[in-house]
Swiss-Prot record:
Domain of life: Eukaryota
Record-level GO BP terms: chromatin remodeling; negative regulation of DNA-templated transcription; negative regulation of transcription by RNA polymerase II; regulation of transcription by RNA polymerase II; regulation of transcription regulatory region DNA binding
Annotated function: Transcription factor that represses the transcription of a wide range of genes involved in cell proliferation and differentiation. Directly and specifically binds to the consensus sequence 5'-[GA][CA]GACCCCCCCCC-3' and represses transcription both by regulating the organization of chromatin and through the direct recruitment of transcription factors to gene regulatory regions. May also play a role, independently of its transcriptional activity, in double-strand break repair via classical non-homologous end joining/cNHEJ and in alternative splicing.
Keyword Cell division part of the UniProt annotation: no
Protein name (Swiss-Prot/TrEMBL): Zinc finger and BTB domain-containing protein 7A
Organism for this UniProt entry: Gallus gallus
């Protein structure tokens, strides 16, 4: 192919990453395709483990410990607050962190424990410059809760030191305080017997003599959900659990209510007796019917849980007060010190992640689409220009503008014409240049119908040439198809005289006659300026037609 390019061509899609992130956030809010639930202070946060692992090094180490079939679907952590985790999840899915004076300390501690350096640096900088922190809270900013730090460390070390997660009863606790805690994040305490079971507590795989009964449930703990491969084949047996890899379809013995279990048809043995008997194996028909009922029940229960959590989070977000956010922006951007206007963390590389979320400007109440666009809009009110050229010290409000500006110093011309090989520093220059090859002249004067390649040429034509509704006679010449048809100048060119008055009149008639035709633009700006000067001199020296 003539003029083509050999080899592969990379075609970028700038909005692809923001679309993916927006879709993941929509799935999280609706409880769709979430493969892990984080339980904090009784609140459930369904999310995607891949998103958490990409954002937090702590979750990455937690989720990658052990085999895939031995991973949990529910993790209960008590070393961070629910509000802090909610803010961090919003940051992971929307690239926007919402902080206020009331929760900045909790978010900072959670970011340190979960190893999220971006949030940690921002909160630390805000607290160091006293933008959000109060005077009576400064002594709490510089220290992390050591108890929560030990809990997070031991919680992670437990999964890393037990990759199979099959024998967790003899875990060597290094902290005696944690060993005596009533609420632990994993199976390290005695199970409290409770007659009623809601079917949402999952037990880890333990020896047969230590397994909880089918109607035992501990509401204050969230044990692990591991299963040996051998028991996956007999998942319908009492006391066993389905593999967590089966999309949340767990055994019906742990999901059914006592009333349903007593009245279940075809039950040959009592559930508790059957759970205590290792040799009990149901018949094929009973196991098939029981498994079918269990799958439907488990799927409906989990779907209701995910939906209720999503609706609860949406309702909480709608009821959230915006006063903290407004105070944050007003305090942050209202500072007169240069160190406050240009913080160090704001000069880092901005990620072009623009989640399609609607946010309202706290200053002018304008609704901004895109999570990453609100800080950029705020700079229009404050005049902040955090991005500075290290060569000429020119400042910019956006990083992409600084990147384009640097091409003036480096001479970089990344935009290449595939037809003639000409290189340009800006994309719009290449776009205008391509019209030379295509012949496209999209800008037309409404008065004289002259067409132009660029909009600034049309603007110059309207402003300087004085096109006021009739075809202009200054600074233009008629479109001539043959070189012999051009008028021959005579005498001094500065006088503007042409050979014979008839040819001059004929030239003017030609201009008026071709007023509605498309004319070729002058080859250069200097040539156009020369024509304007010559035309002005000719019109000024020669008397006009009577």
């Amino acid at each position: 192919m003539a003029g083509g390019v050999d080899g592969p061509i990379g075609i970028p899609f700038p909005d692809h990453s923001s679309d993916i992130l927006s879709s993941l956030n929509e799935q999280r809010n609706n409880g769709l395709l979430c493969d892990v639930v984080i339980l904090v202070e009784g609140q459930e946060f369904p999310t995607h483990r891949s998103v958490l692992a990409a954002c937090s090094q702590y979750f990455k180490k937690l989720f990658t410990s052990g085999l895939v079939v031995d991973q949990q679907n529910v993790y209960e952590i008590d070393f961070v607050s629910a509000d802090a985790l909610s803010a961090l999840l919003e940051f992971a899915y929307t690239a926007t962190l919402t902080v206020s004076t009331s929760n900045v300390n909790d978010i900072l501690n959670a970011a340190k424990l979960l190893e999220i350096p971006a949030v940690r640096d921002v909160c630390t900088d805000l607290l160091d410059r006293k933008i959000l922190a109060k005077n009576d809270q400064m002594d709490l900013v510089d220290q992390i809760d050591q108890r929560n730090h030990l809990r997070a460390k031991e919680y992670l070390e437990f999964f890393q030191s037990n990759p199979v997660n099959g024998h967790q009863g003899s875990f060597p606790w290094t902290n005696p305080e944690l060993r005596d805690l009533q609420r632990l994040n994993f199976r390290g305490q005695e199970d409290e017997e409770e007659p009623d079971c809601n079917g949402l507590d999952f037990y880890s795989q333990a020896p047969l003599n230590e397994r909880p009964k089918a109607n035992d449930c501990d509401p204050d703990s969230n044990p692990a959900m591991w299963l040996d491969r051998e028991e996956e084949e007999a998942a319908a047996a009492p006391g066993s659990l389905f593999s967590p890899s089966q999309n949340g379809h767990y055994s019906g013995r742990g999901l059914g209510t006592p009333g349903e279990e007593e009245g279940a048809p075809g039950a040959a043995l009592d559930q508790q007796d059957a759970g205590d008997s290792p040799s009990f194996v149901p018949t094929g028909a009973e196991a098939e019917d029981d498994a079918r009922d269990v799958d439907g029940l488990a799927a409906s229960v989990l779907q209701q849980v995910m939906g209720s959590v999503g609706r609860q989070q949406l309702g909480d977000d709608e009821r959230k007060d915006d006063d903290g956010v407004v105070d944050y922006y007003l305090k942050y951007f209202g500072s007169s010190n240069e160190s406050d206007v240009y913080p160090s963390w704001s000069q880092k590389v901005e990620k072009k992640i623009r989640a399609k979320a609607f946010q309202k400007c706290p200053i002018c109440a304008k609704v901004i689409q895109g999570a990453g666009k609100l800080p950029r809009h705020i700079r229009t009110h404050t005049g902040e220009k955090p991005y500075e050229c290290n060569i000429c010290n020119v400042r910019f409000t956006r990083q992409d503008k600084l990147k384009v500006h640097m091409r003036k110093h480096t001479g970089e011309k990344p935009y290449l014409c595939q037809q003639c090989g000409a290189a340009f520093a800006h994309n719009y220059d290449l776009k205008n240049h391509m019209r030379v090859h295509t012949g496209l002249r999209p800008y037309q004067c409404d008065s004289c119908f002259k067409t132009f390649v660029r909009s600034d040429h049309l603007h110059r034509h309207l402003k300087k040439d004085g096109c006021n509704g009739i075809p202009s006679r200054r600074g233009r010449r008629p479109r001539v198809r043959d070189a012999g048809g051009l008028p021959t100048p005579t005498g001094n060119p500065e006088d503007g005289g042409f050979q014979g008055g008839g040819e001059s009149q004929e030239s003017e008639d030609t201009v008026q006659g071709n007023g509605r035709e498309q004319h070729f633009e002058e080859s250069s700006t200097a040539e156009a300026a020369g024509l304007n000067v010559a035309g002005g001199a000719a019109e000024g020296s020669a008397p006009g037609p009577s």
